[in-house]
């Protein structure tokens, strides 16, 4: 898992790269970024992915989208974002995502997920795995596994997981979900989302070059193909759509639910898996997830990639996947990290994007508005990192600023940012990119058929609290994980 220092002891583990015995042998790698386990990184290995046509991950714009991020005052920018047009070599398909890292190496985790999750999603979609009968199959494997566990604590935790998942799932646009009208595309993409998220999290644990034990990231992602929209969400980043109501008034529609520990179903799952959920006295509005016998790490979300110190205690990486068929009244979608939602309401965000001088500047206008709101509302708090993706659903507007030459337009100094960004990442870059038909992530972790069925069943039954728009943090400085990290036990 790499070398980790506890809050109580600053001395490194014997045999770690920080110990005196390694001071000579490791001298050549002394400039390696903390948290990275692979020092043989070559920037050229990232170039194929960075140069894929239609893929934009730095501040810029195209005819249909714009993205922008700004570093806060809490350290490295842990937010990442991507827009990928012609996704999977499909001319009518676009992938968008924002990722909010947290923990000591959250910026590395967010960038790794940004780069690898779309490839896995495209690969599973490309494989066209048959899903008829699988999504509706109810197996007894999970229950049987629970009854066969000898350890009472483990059996109770597993039984709690099953019980929590038996409740029906309700996503932000549940009224749109009628299985009789959902196209086959949704069923295929839903399984692809579930597989990709599962394998991505496993890869972070077993084959990642970044220490994810106490670090992780959120992910709110979408695939738009024609008039069909599929959204997959983990964590407390959010997707909101600007659409016209019956009176032609622009209104905000929240497409995702902030998956935080304050949701009853999420809290129940965590507690029954022996995790603890409570808020600190200084910030009673923010429920956090804690280890059973240790006041750490204090994670402010119920689902996330990474954070493996909590994965045995109720934290999961299963996405909430929802479907929506777009209409001519739907104008744009905004994906943003909690640095935006902590200080701006859904209505504020939709109004800012709609009133932006041009489509190319909408994301930047939104981020800058959020930064001003932070300074105005919480002058004594540090501004959080902010990242936003604005996807326009009707590209025929003559005000749409960009041409092909403006795709992934870099501002002054961003060429250096690109190099620094990739150097901060791990060494496992793709070896080449043609059609995204394989998962390019080093050693692949496959899911067998029974595991896939179980995964889909669990995702179908995960419950979110209906009928409520869950706002983000109100009035305190945002920290997703506290600084007291659990001690690394040698040999585990």
UniProtKB/Swiss-Prot annotation:
Residues 64-393 form the PPM-type phosphatase domain. SUPFAM superfamilies: PP2C-like (SSF81606). Transmembrane segments: none annotated. Residues 24-35 have a biased composition (Basic residues). Keywords: Hydrolase, Magnesium, Manganese, Metal-binding, Protein phosphatase. Residues 441-460 have a biased composition (Basic and acidic residues). InterPro entries: PP2C, PPM-type-like_dom_sf, PPM-type_phosphatase-like_dom. Its cofactor is Mg(2+); Mn(2+). Mn(2+) 2 binds at residues 100, 338, 384. PROSITE patterns: PPM_2. It catalyses: O-phospho-L-seryl-[protein] + H2O = L-seryl-[protein] + phosphate; O-phospho-L-threonyl-[protein] + H2O = L-threonyl-[protein] + phosphate. Residues 412-427 have a biased composition (Acidic residues). Its EC number is 3.1.3.16. It is an enzyme of class 3 (hydrolase). Mn(2+) 1 binds at residues 100-101. Signal peptide: none annotated. Binds 2 magnesium or manganese ions per subunit. Residues 1-46, 406-468 are annotated as: Disordered. One of its GO terms (molecular function) is metal ion binding. Belongs to the PP2C family. This is Probable protein phosphatase 2C 33. It comes from Arabidopsis thaliana (Mouse-ear cress).
């Amino acid at each position: 898992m790499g070398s980790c220092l506890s809050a109580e002891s600053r001395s490194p583990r014997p045999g770690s790269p920080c110990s005196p015995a390694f001071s000579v042998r490791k001298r050549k790698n002394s400039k390696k970024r903390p948290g990275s386990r692979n020092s043989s990184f070559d920037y050229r290995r990232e170039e194929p992915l960075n140069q894929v046509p239609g893929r934009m991950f730095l501040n810029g714009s195209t005819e249909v989208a714009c993205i922008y991020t700004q570093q806060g005052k809490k350290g490295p920018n842990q937010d990442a974002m991507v827009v990928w047009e012609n996704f999977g070599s499909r001319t009518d398909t676009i992938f968008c995502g924002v990722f909010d890292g947290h923990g000591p190496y959250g910026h590395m985790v967010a960038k790794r997920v940004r780069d690898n999750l779309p490839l896995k999603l495209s690969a599973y979609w490309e494989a066209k795995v048959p899903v008829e009968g699988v999504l509706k199959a109810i197996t007894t494997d999970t229950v049987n596994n629970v009854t066969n566990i000898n350890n009472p604590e483990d059996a109770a935790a597993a039984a709690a997981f099953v019980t929590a998942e038996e409740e029906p799932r309700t996503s932000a646009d549940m009224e749109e979900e009628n299985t009789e009208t959902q196209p086959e595309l949704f069923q295929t993409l839903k399984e692809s989302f579930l597989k990709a998220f599962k394998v991505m999290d496993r890869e972070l644990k077993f084959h990642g070059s970044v220490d994810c034990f106490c670090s992780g990231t959120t992910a709110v992602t979408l695939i738009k193909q024609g008039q069909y929209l599929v959204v997959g969400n983990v964590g407390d980043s959010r997707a909101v759509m600007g659409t016209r109501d019956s009176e032609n008034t622009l209104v905000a529609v929240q497409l995702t639910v902030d998956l935080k520990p304050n949701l009853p179903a999420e809290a129940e799952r965590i507690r029954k898996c022996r995790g603890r959920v409570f808020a600190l006295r200084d910030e009673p509005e923010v429920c956090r997830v804690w280890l059973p016998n240790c006041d750490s790490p204090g994670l402010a979300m119920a689902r996330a990639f990474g954070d493996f110190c909590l994965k045995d205690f109720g934290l999961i990486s299963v996405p909430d996947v929802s479907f929506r068929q777009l209409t001519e009244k739907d104008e744009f979608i905004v994906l943003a990290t909690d640095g935006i939602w902590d200080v701006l309401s859904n209505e504020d965000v939709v109004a800012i994007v709609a009133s932006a001088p041009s489509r190319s500047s909408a994301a930047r206008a939104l981020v800058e508005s959020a930064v001003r709101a932070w300074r105005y509302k919480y002058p004594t708090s540090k501004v959080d990192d902010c990242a936003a993706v604005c996807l326009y659903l009707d590209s025929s507007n003559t005000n749409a600023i960009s041409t092909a030459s403006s795709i992934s337009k870099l501002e002054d100094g961003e060429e250096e940012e690109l190099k620094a960004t990739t150097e901060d990442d791990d060494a496992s870059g793709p070896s080449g990119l043609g059609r995204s038909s394989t998962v390019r992530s080093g050693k692949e972790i496959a899911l067998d058929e029974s595991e896939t069925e179980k995964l889909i069943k669990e995702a179908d039954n995960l419950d979110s609290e209906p009928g409520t728009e869950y706002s983000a943090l109100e009035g305190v400085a945002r920290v997703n994980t506290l600084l007291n990290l659990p001690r690394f036990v040698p040999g585990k």
